[in-house]
A protein has these predicted regions:
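Phosphate/diphosphate-binding loops
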Residues: 13, 403-404, 409-413, 417-420, ...
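Long, contiguous, secondary-structure-rich segments that constitute the structural scaffold
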Residues: 468-514, 599, 604-617, 621-703
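Short beta-alpha connecting loops at secondary-structure transitions
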Residues: 214-222, 435, 450-462, 607
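N-terminal export/assembly segments and adjacent metallocofactor-ligating motifs
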Residues: 1-241, 255, 278, 389, ...
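Active-site phosphate/pyrophosphate-binding segments
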Residues: 234, 253-370
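N-terminal leader/propeptide and maturation segments of large enzyme subunits in energy/redox metabolism
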Residues: 73-84, 241-279, 458-540, 588, ...
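Glycine-rich phosphate/diphosphate-binding loops that line cofactor/substrate pockets in enzymes
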Residues: 91-110, 163-172, 262, 283-296, ...
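Extended redox/cofactor-interaction regions of prokaryotic respiratory oxidoreductases
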Residues: 125-194, 198-205, 212, 228-232, ...
Length: 703
């Protein structure tokens, strides 16, 4: 009879692309095997709660289809022919191909391409050290945060806000533009605590009746891309009804009189016509926050993934400034704490030898880059070699057809370092197997909360699997730059140096003992009661959209992006979205699925079985007009391509709006083309970004 394995408990942090960065307790069954993963109860933001997909992480780390050996392509790209190759030979091949590309076209012909498949600062960002040391093309990270961060920053002047734990002390929690039940479960933990202990109301604003909307006391379902109009109506009502805090406005904001005059025509009736909301619902929401000083606005990314997304974020975060909610514990607003952590990544990233004259390529425009668009290439050489880590561009990037066409080029060498045979890995010349987060050392910071969290190595990886850090280091040695600063150090060395530089004198060992560091600023700083982070200390209702610093401003060589002339002077609804027309009558949003995180977890049985299959939600009125019923196979399309999938008829969505949840593998769709076939890569004003939820399509029935 087999004895059960002894269980010990290890401590880590969730590495995935989620603002929560949950602190974790992990069952360790032996040196290579894990059991259940739980949220750390001792961490007062995680509060013992994590999402179901991470709780089932044993299913992923021990998956039968996990990549375990380096593979070299045999036959044509994408045909699926592979042969095993040793690690030394594989890395020799990468170095050889990089040097060939450099000899033919110069160093900029090599493009290391990465993103947030891990949020660990060492394993994610160390690729830049190799990039800068070798003068390879830079990457402008536009795919996720640009619209949201730009919109917040132009108002507040810093990326911080009210302590996210204060949601539990609020009397009204407004969850705007994020399906927190699916994507940020800890938001619901603290909002539910406020409801239980204080009788707080939960307001949810989104474009369809998702799981978070179903938990709301007041649910406002508006048309995609119209959040700014709702925000303006709320502020109009505040000035109209005397619930605007004029004393706060005079002390803390730049031009309240100009804003009030601007909003005179932004009535609830005006907003109702734009948003599709009832005037009564807008008035009720305004009355609630007008009488509730402790109103906490938790602002997500989803509503900013429109072509007017930066404008929408600025308009929405202006609301608590007009009402004066910032003055009260449990009030104000929060989007990201990315400014508070004080971690200097320069050694990890090798920024000391970054050359600003080297071109920077827009990651969201990878399709245009790889298919030779001169503007996307900054009028420079073609990209001839790539190392891709922590992302799956053939699946997650906009304008999927040119992305895949570019990756399939015979004259492009692509090495993909991955955990599974993703859509991108399937188009590579060389695939290297990567460790998972419990198999290496790293450090994390939670933009959606307030902690630096250590993720130490807890189990041994399979013998033939290697870390990102190993790949950077080995390529640096083969490419002749291993003597540069930052190379030759272990992950723990880099963590120790960075933590000590931030003032935590015990470094790695101290963090390992304590598990996390709480970096939340004092109340007055978090609530901007000492002034907003501009020289005059004023919140800016009149932002400088293009003239100042931004958290992710494009390099000067790229300049402002998108139709900047359409950006408004004051908070407003900007008509910059992809508007429906007679040829494309439906607005399509590609919303997150509960069981997936971008394209991660789409390979695990538990997540796949709970999600079912790719489906398209349509309102019954639209289905009846099109002569369609549930289960029909439909095609949706625009000038970027077409996608076939099954139909779900539901009042969850508004008439004229289609919703597809989750980034399924391309191969899960009937024609092998994923939902981002339909997503545009045109840059969003003012500093770029991908408008994933801002697409117009036609719809046709018939298989």
């Amino acid at each position: 009879m087999n004895k059960p394995l002894p269980v010990t408990m290890g401590h880590s942090a969730c590495p995935h692309d989620c603002p929560s960065t949950c602190a974790l307790d992990v069952e360790l069954l032996d040196g290579r095997t894990i059991g259940r993963v739980r949220g750390a109860a001792a961490n007062d933001y995680t509060a013992g709660v994590i999402c179901a997909k991470v709780a089932r992480y044993a299913e992923r780390i021990h998956h039968k289809d996990r990549l375990l050996k380096p593979l070299q392509r045999v036959g044509a790209k994408g045909e699926g022919g592979w042969r095993e190759i040793g690690w030394d030979d594989a890395l020799d091949l990468v170095a050889e191909e990089f040097l060939k590309a450099e000899a033919r076209h110069g160093s900029e012909a090599v493009w290391p391409y990465q993103y947030a498949g891990t949020m660990g600062l060492v394993q994610r960002d160390g690729i830049h050290r190799l990039r800068h040391a070798k003068r390879y093309s830079g990457q402008f990270d536009t795919i996720c945060t640009n619209m949201a961060w730009t919109g917040w920053f132009v108002g507040a002047g810093a990326m911080r806000g009210a302590d996210p734990r204060e949601m539990a002390k609020s009397d009204c929690v407004i969850i705007w533009g994020t399906n927190a039940v699916a994507t940020q479960v800890n938001v619901m933990t603290h909002a539910a605590k406020a409801r239980k202990e204080r009788g707080a109301k939960i307001v949810v604003i989104d474009i369809y009746d998702n799981a978070t909307m179903k938990q709301a006391d007041l649910a406002l379902k508006l048309r995609p891309g119209t959040d700014g109009a709702l925000a303006c109506a709320l502020m109009h009502i505040a000035f109209r009804d005397g619930t605007a805090d004029r004393g706060y406005l005079a002390r803390y904001t730049d031009d309240p009189a100009g804003l009030e005059a601007h909003l005179a025509t932004r009535t609830p009736q005006w907003a109702a016509a734009i948003t599709g909301l009832d005037v009564e619902a807008i008035e009720a929401f305004a009355a609630l926050i007008g009488r509730t000083q402790r109103s906490y606005f938790r602002l997500g990314y989803g509503f900013t993934r429109q072509r007017n997304g930066a404008v929408a974020m600025h308009a929405v975060m202006s609301v608590p400034a007009v009402y004066g909610h910032w003055q009260h514990e449990g009030g104000g607003a929060f989007h990201s704490n990315s400014d508070i952590f004080g971690l200097d990544k320069s050694e990890i990233m090798g920024t000391a030898y970054r050359d600003p004259s080297i071109r920077t390529l827009d990651q969201s425009r990878i399709g245009a880059v790889l298919t030779g668009d001169a503007e996307a290439l900054c009028d420079g050489p073609p990209v001839a070699a790539m190392l891709i880590q922590n992302t799956n561009p053939a699946n997650v990037c906009p304008e999927q057809r040119p992305v895949r066409r570019g990756l399939a080029r015979d004259d492009l060498f692509t090495c993909v370092h991955e955990q599974f045979m993703t859509d991108t890995a399937g188009l590579a010349d060389l695939v290297l197997p990567a460790t998972m987060f419990l198999e290496h050392d790293d450090i994390y910071r939670g933009g959606g909360q307030n902690h630096i969290v250590l993720g130490p190595k807890l189990v041994e990886p399979p013998e033939t699997v290697r870390t990102n850090h190993f790949v950077f280091e080995e390529l640096a040695r083969r490419l002749g730059v291993a003597d540069r600063p930052g190379f030759g150090l272990t992950e723990r060395d880099l963590i120790d140096n960075m933590v000590k530089k931030a003032g935590h004198t015990e470094g790695y060992e101290g963090l390992k003992r304590d598990r996390w560091i709480d970096c939340q600023p004092p109340f007055e700083e978090a609530h901007f009661l000492n002034g907003f982070a501009w020289p005059d200390g004023k919140f800016r209702f009149k932002p400088d959209w293009t003239g100042g610093y931004a958290p992710n401003r494009p390099p000067d060589s790229l300049g402002p992006q998108g139709p900047v002339a359409g950006l408004p002077v004051f908070p407003d609804h900007a008509e910059l979205i992809e508007a429906a027309d007679a040829s494309h009558p439906y607005r399509l949003a590609t919303s997150p699925a509960r069981q997936f995180l971008n394209s991660t977890f789409a390979e695990t049985t538990g997540s796949r079985s709970r999600e079912g299959a790719p489906e398209l939600m349509i309102h019954p009125e639209d289905a009846a007009r099109e002569g369609l019923v549930a289960g029909d196979i439909v095609t949706i399309g625009n000038e970027r391509g077409e996608v076939r999938l099954s139909l779900t008829v539901t009042e969850t969505v508004k008439p004229g709006v289609l919703v597809h949840e989750g980034i399924w593998a391309n191969t899960d769709f009937l024609d092998g083309e994923g939902i981002n076939t339909l997503t545009g890569a045109d840059p969003v004003a003012p500093f770029g970004g991908a408008a994933f939820h801002d697409n117009c399509v036609w719809l046709r029935g018939g298989a």
